[in-house]
Amino acid sequence: MYKDIATPGRTKEILERYGFSFKKSLGQNFLIDANILRKIVDVADISPDTGAIEIGPGIGALTEQLARRAKKVVAFEIDGRLLPILADTLSPYDNVRIFHQDVLKADLHAVIAEELADVSDRMVVANLPYYVTTPIIMKLLTERLPIRGMVVMLQKEVADRLAAKPGTKDYGSLTIAVQYYTEAEVIMTVPRTVFMPQPNVDSAVIRLVKRQHPPVVVDDEGVFFQVVRASFAQRRKTLFNNLTNNLPGGKENKEQIERVLVALGIDPRRRGETLDIAEFASLSNALAPLFGK
């Protein structure tokens, strides 16, 4: 059995050997506790039938744990300085393919079709860079990829937002999007002390299992997400003010918006953060004739 990468000593030795310096702009924080990585792989239920998709492999600490259990691992790394390190640390494994690419610009459907066509199970497993967590999550959710779901480590405050309940400070448009596409569960908190370099905040591992069907019936998804985003645009404002000020054409349709809210039994003075996903669905369906294409 090969020695784990995710120990303080081995990580330091690898970084010193290659003269690697962390780039703050890329949100590079490498995990140095292999037990946490094994737990992540367990939670993701990685098996010999799984094709794992990783984002930001760093020096390969999570990648090697995935490679030991999965049929194949496909990883996206934006920092070219890490490619020779990954070629070295992952040399014992012949089931890993590294793409030197920004995952936000990648055609994931094409990569999956080319690299993971022969696996029956696909899962995203990643320690996401803090600076692009939300765009990556939104891309993975909205592109309707042929995956079972994702297990990701991210900033604890973002994890709290993903799994928040209505009426709480963490509840927002990201929560609704996650709820619409997946079932979310925060698995564990990961202290900042198990990273190199140590970040200023704690992390959390969250599991998102893709839903076969959304939990609500939505007539026009474009309008649904438009209404959700508008409702949270200015958290201190009322739902009515947010909709009229932030929906395109909202001011011109002010009276109709108020009529719709009253007809649905939604007090126009409520704030967006108090509505649950079912209320947002009803509201967007009623507004779709006004704001749909």
From Swiss-Prot:
The keyword Cytoplasm applies. It is an enzyme of class 2 (transferase). Disulfide bonds: none annotated. S-adenosyl-L-methionine binds at N29, L31, G56, E77, D102, N127. The keyword Zinc does not apply. GO terms for molecular function: 16S rRNA (adenine(1518)-N(6)/adenine(1519)-N(6))-dimethyltransferase activity; RNA binding. Its main location: cytoplasm. It catalyses: adenosine(1518)/adenosine(1519) in 16S rRNA + 4 S-adenosyl-L-methionine = N(6)-dimethyladenosine(1518)/N(6)-dimethyladenosine(1519) in 16S rRNA + 4 S-adenosyl-L-homocysteine + 4 H(+). Its EC number is 2.1.1.182. PANTHER family: DIMETHYLADENOSINE TRANSFERASE, DIMETHYLADENOSINE TRANSFERASE-RELATED. HAMAP family: 16SrRNA_methyltr_A. Specifically dimethylates two adjacent adenosines (A1518 and A1519) in the loop of a conserved hairpin near the 3'-end of 16S rRNA in the 30S particle. May play a critical role in biogenesis of 30S subunits. Belongs to the class I-like SAM-binding methyltransferase superfamily. rRNA adenine N(6)-methyltransferase family. RsmA subfamily. This is Ribosomal RNA small subunit methyltransferase A. It comes from Geobacillus kaustophilus (strain HTA426).
